[in-house]
Amino acid sequence: MYRIEKIGENCFYIKTLGTFPPSVAERFIQDFNEITKGLPEFCTIIDNLDAILLDVHSFNIILDLMIKSNERLIKSAFVISQNPPLDKEFQLLLEKAASPKRKIVRNLEEAKKWVGLEDIIIQRED
């Protein structure tokens, strides 16, 4: 599961939950491309605090989106906390996507600082 929220003129907060099977990854790509279609550039905070693992088949789907969006990306923060397998998956994704504009962070405050949105308040749902 995922949710995409606009948190600035060209910035988005993406919340992921559980696993990310290929059908969900493909729907996410469609939704994200539709939302960012008219934007020359954008930034994202991807909140993976409640994610478990990225499905193996979804890895390439997400990687393709990341590579295609490299030019338009301002900055992107991937929030991962205390999940070594997920951390490793995203390290591999970031290496393969080859962009210094992406970073793994440990909490939402670090993410906001990295993308330059310190004034935004993001409340976690429990």
What are these regions (language model features)?
Residues 1-126:
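Amphipathic, Lys/Arg-enriched alpha-helical "gate/interface" segment within cytosolic domains
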